[in-house]
Amino acid sequence: MTRPVLVTSASGGRQGKTGRHVSELLLKRGIPVRAFVHKIDERSERLRALGAEIFEGDFLDIRSVQRAVQGTSSIYFAYPVQDGLMDATAAMALAAREAGVSRLVNLVMLQSTPDAPTPRMRQNYLSEQVFEWANIGAVHIRATVFYENLGAAARQSLPAQGAVRLPWGSESTVLPLVAGEDVARVAVGLLTSPQLVAGAAYPVIGTTISLREIITTFARVLGKNVRYEEISDDEWRSHAAARGYNEHAIAHLSALWRALRGAAIDPNDPRYAVTDTIEKIGGAKPKTFEAFVREGQSELLAKSA
């Protein structure tokens, strides 16, 4: 009997919902999935209906993680943007090594270095080192900002005000973006590839696009006037806190927004250039930002509660 793949954050969260996409893509291929979820709800039941084994667990409880990993062949590790990454990494690395896991695909942010611009990115660097020391066949996906992040931000003001309000500088600011589904395709490619070099890192950028182009795309696809309003970091943090973002996520995203608006992003710079990873490993061309907006029109125009 084929051992299942353990997929963490399988229900999906605020970001690109990559765990949910990975689970669905694996199940479509007939690969058994053990979906690691924080709680049982309608999202986990949807995965159960698709054929996934549901495991309700806690990233920070080593016994819970050991039970989740036992009997699995490989792991997709995507820790939410919240406190606890290093504890979760240590628990997963230990459990995976004990269980004889031979492959772990680790999702991190675009830059993963000791001097990366956000606290979460610097933690991601440490997390990578721990997984590699564990000798469990770890590889790392370094994904850029998700379309879904931008979509969530737009929904807060676009329906009522016809505006996208963010601290991203002028409309000439260029952003490296990617669809969560494309990141999931890369993850599935790495989880199922017969040839894999442990310790390898795969940058994933689907497109580079200016704020001006983003606003123009919203207006064209949604059929309404859309404008960009630059707000201060403090105003963004206040809005984010009111929407329930945790302090870790606010600190990470605030630093990320500063870094992006302060960088004169050159698409030829390898740190920000569109990568061929999605097509070569994920098996499909990157989703365009316009396609993302078309697919999410109803959500983008729905007023937030």
Predicted features along the sequence, with ranges:
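Oxidoreductase cofactor-interface core, primarily capturing Rossmann-like NAD(P)-dependent enzymes
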Residues: M1-R46, L60-R63, R67-T72, V81-G84, ...
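Residues lining the SAM
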Residues: T8, A78, G283
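Low-complexity, intrinsically disordered/propeptide-like segments
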Residues: G30, L50, K303-S304
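Short, conserved active-site loop motifs that form the nucleotide-linked donor/cofactor pocket
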Residues: G51-E53, A138
